Design a protein with these regions (language model features):
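Bacterial N-terminal signal peptides
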Residues: 1-9
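Boundary at the C-terminal end of the N-terminal hydrophobic targeting segment
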Residues: 8-16
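Glycan-processing catalytic domains of CAZymes
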Residues: 15-394, 458
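Short, surface-exposed loop/turn motifs at beta-strand boundaries within globular domains
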Residues: 25, 394, 411, 420, ...
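Hydrophobic residues embedded in beta-strands of well-ordered beta-sheets
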Residues: 157, 418, 423-426, 458
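Extracellular glycan-recognition surfaces and repeat-rich motifs
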Residues: 403-424
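Extracellular ligand-binding interfaces
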Residues: 427-526, 534-549
């Protein structure tokens, strides 16, 4: 009675820490794709300023906080999820978005939830090599594979590869540079052989390689090739995008390829399972898609799946469980659970509460005699909040980048690997002309006080990709004011207003550039947001020495 009273009052004295997880049973093993994408408040700002209803029940939380992670673990395992497949980034030794894993290994309840990596190798051409494969495998062995928390199958640590073709391309190119010819697929096989040898020398029985299946139709030759290369299983990412083609009967007359209802996803998922079940060459895990609405990232270029509800998601879960029972499938994967910016999220949030997690539990798990574990929020037991402090906003419109990014953050579909190195702000260009590279909310300043935007920077094309056919590269600056905000109604971007540009050189040398703003009719009012694109050359590396308004 005393504990119940304290619980009702939300007294922290009753629960000094996150209540211990209560496991639920299922005859199907459930993995969830986890994207550790919010290492700073600026990433949450993207959601807060566009789709605030997506706010997690943990708040705009510090994703590396072990206590917050213990809540994630508790909620996952109490709803049948037993492992996370975590996006893991490595680019020639450069690692990023490690904050969640570092916090996980300090979390009290980490023993309840295994993890393994989805090697997110969507890097620039030339990033993979024999030397790099040795280095990355060494890192895996020394830091992850021998820890009890790392997920294994038959004693083999599991590794999912995001883009095998990137790996294959670079190993084929490396061989060609030495006068050797490799056929498509042999590069992957060579890379895997390096890792297999190293893990066996370290006392492990091998690696359980998992493929990221790419096609919407069954392809027996594809499956056979993957097995020959060393893969042992497959999953599929983004099956909801195939809905317009595979389930036209579920599309409404007003639907388009980039805007359609979740009913089409409910209809499509079983068709994908049926397609992949036609072969037993490469075992696949039953995919449970969580939706898509990437307006916070893609704006005008977004794909929006509407009408997603816990009830409709529950229907997919029930069908998935029935499929597993019918065909003896013992592994399902929910993907992803926390892509907040892309609209693929089911972790407990303000919009749906625990509804999406409950749908998984109710479909796959055996209800205990005493009932399901109670869905507890941090505030219920006097814990939290775990929010980041507000994002830094530059007090003056000038940036030197001596030792920090000074409030700038990357556009997810525009810039990658943002960091300060050697006194410069560094990043590389992805999705040119789809988005700007970096952005910042600034302390509002009066446009009339400044006539010029100056930048000293270096643009270096990727050695393999070159200029990508861009003959006259330019840099762009976009600004927002109260009268003309950058993000307009419907999360659309007006590319015609509040933008200026100038030519740049992409030859690996530093130059100073200036954009004349004085004659631009939109350069007025109080500027409160800035977006910057260094150049439209895919994979180019950029180093910004300084920026300033004068």
């Amino acid at each position: 009675m005393i504990a119940a009273a304290c619980f009702a009052a939300g007294a922290r004295t009753a629960f000094a820490y996150v209540p211990e997880p209560r496991l639920v049973k299922s005859d199907v093993e459930i993995t969830a794709i986890y994207y550790p994408g919010t290492e700073q408040m600026s990433e949450w700002d993207v959601i807060a300023g566009t789709c605030p209803e997506r706010k997690p029940l943990l708040g705009w939380f510090d994703e590396g906080n072990p206590e917050a992670i213990d809540w994630q673990i508790k909620w996952a395992v109490e709803h049948g999820i037993t492992s996370f497949c975590v996006d893991w980034y490595w680019n020639k030794g450069y690692r990023r978005l490690e904050h969640w894993l570092k916090g996980y290994y300090r979390a009290k309840y980490r023993g309840y939830l295994k993890w393994f990596m989805m090697y997110a190798n969507h890097n620039q051409p030339g990033s993979h090599s024999t030397e790099d494969q040795i280095a990355v495998t060494k890192y895996w062995i020394e830091n992850y594979f021998k820890t009890p928390e790392y997920y294994t199958i038959d004693g083999k640590p599991a590794v999912c590869i995001w883009d095998a073709e990137n790996l294959d391309r670079d190993f084929i190119d490396e061989a060609a540079a030495k006068g050797e010819t490799l056929k498509p697929g042999e590069g992957i096989k060579r890379a895997f052989a390096i890792s297999e040898r190293m893990v066996r020398e370290a006392g492990l029985p091998g690696i359980y390689w998992i493929d990221m299946w790419r096609t919407k139709k069954f392809d027996l030759d594809y499956a056979k090739r993957r097995v020959e290369q060393g893969y042992r299983a497959a999953i599929h990412y983004g099956i909801e995008h195939f809905s317009p083609d595979l389930s036209p009967e579920a599309m409404k007359p007003s639907d388009t390829r980039n805007r359609f209802g979740y009913d089409a996803v409910v209809a499509t998922a079983p068709k994908i399972w049926d397609e992949l079940s036609r072969q037993n060459v490469l075992p696949f895990w039953v995919i449970i898609p969580t939706g898509w609405d990437d307006r916070p990232r893609s704006f005008t270029h977004s794909r929006v799946i509407t009408g997603r509800t816990p009830e409709k998601f529950a229907e997919i879960c029930r069908r998935a469980k029935a499929f597993c029972d019918k065909y003896g499938r013992k592994h399902a994967i929910v993907l992803p659970i926390n892509e907040w910016q892309e609209g693929s999220y089911i972790e407990p949030n303000e919009e749906y509460g625990f509804g999406m997690y409950d749908a998984i539990r109710d479909a796959f798990c055996e209800k205990p005699t005493g009932g399901w574990p109670k869905n507890i929020r941090p505030g219920d037991v006097g814990m939290g909040p775990y929010d980041f402090p507000p994002s830094f906003r530059s007090p003056t419109p000038r940036w030197e980048f001596a030792d920090s990014v000074e409030g700038w953050y990357r556009q997810p579909y525009g810039g990658g690997e943002l960091e300060v190195k050697d006194g410069s702000l560094n990043f590389w260009v992805n999705f040119p002309r789809r988005n700007y590279n970096i952005r910042q909310r600034v302390v509002p300043f009066e446009a009339a006080k400044y006539k010029t935007f100056r930048v000293r920077m270096r643009v270096t094309p990727n050695a393999k990709a070159g200029s990508g056919g861009v003959k006259n590269p330019d840099m762009r600056l976009k600004w927002g004011t109260a009268e003309h905000p950058i993000i307009g109604p419907g999360l659309a971007i007006d590319e015609r207003r509040c933008v200026a540009s100038c030519p740049v050189k992409a030859d690996g040398e530093f130059y100073e550039y200036a954009i004349d703003l004085s004659a631009n009719p939109d350069w007025k009012g109080m500027v409160d947001e800035l977006w910057f694109e260094a150049c439209p050359i895919m994979h180019a590396r950029v180093a910004v020495d300084w920026m300033r308004f004068e």
